[in-house]
C-alpha cells in the first residue's frame, strides 16, 4: 500500500522521492520518470546547484534550475561550503522559482565535491554544516515565501 508524508504544508503522495544525481536527473529525465511512473513519484529534486562559484549567485546559467510545471512538487538541491553564499542562493531560488522545498546536499561522495569540503565533505566539519543549515534556514525564513529546508546526508563519513 502506498503511503504519504507531510513536508510542512505539503501532503506528498506517494512517499517516494526521485534521488537527485548530478548528470543524470535533468529536467527531461525527471519528466520522463514522472510520466512513466504513472505519477508514482511523490517528489522530484533537481540535480545539485553549485553556490560557491559566483561572487553573487545568479539564476541564469544553471541548467539544474530548469523544470517543467508537471514536475511539481519539486525541490531544488544546493551544495557548497560557504554558509553566506548558500543562504543567498537559497533565498534567491525560493523567491524567484518557488520550489516546494530547498535541500542542502551533505551526501555527495564524489572527490571533486567532498574533497573541497562540500557534499559529504561537510560531515567532516559538523560546525560548518550546522552554520550552513542555520544560515540557509534563516534566509528562507526571511524570504517572501514559505519554503521548508531539507537535508540530504549520509550516515557518516567513514
Segments predicted by a language model, with ranges:
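Active-site glycine- and acidic-residue-rich loops that bind
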Residues: 84-86, 127, 148-158
Amino acid at each position: 500500500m502506498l503511503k504519504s508524508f507531510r513536508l510542512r504544508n505539503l501532503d506528498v503522495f506517494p512517499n517516494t522521492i526521485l534521488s537527485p544525481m548530478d548528470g543524470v536527473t535533468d529536467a527531461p529525465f525527471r519528466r520522463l520518470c514522472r510520466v512513466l511512473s504513472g505519477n508514482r513519484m511523490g517528489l522530484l529534486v533537481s540535480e545539485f546547484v553549485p553556490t560557491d562559484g559566483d561572487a553573487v549567485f545568479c539564476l541564469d546559467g544553471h541548467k539544474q534550475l530548469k523544470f517543467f510545471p508537471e514536475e511539481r512538487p519539486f525541490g531544488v538541491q544546493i551544495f557548497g561550503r560557504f554558509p553566506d553564499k548558500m543562504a543567498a542562493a537559497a533565498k534567491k531560488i525560493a523567491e524567484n522559482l518557488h520550489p516546494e522545498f530547498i535541500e542542502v546536499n551533505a551526501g555527495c561522495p564524489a572527490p571533486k565535491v567532498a574533497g573541497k569540503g562540500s557534499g559529504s565533505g561537510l560531515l567532516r566539519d559538523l560546525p560548518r554544516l550546522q552554520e550552513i543549515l542555520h544560515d540557509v534556514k534563516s534566509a528562507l525564513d526571511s524570504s517572501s515565501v514559505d519554503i521548508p529546508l531539507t537535508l540530504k546526508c549520509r550516515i557518516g563519513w567513514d
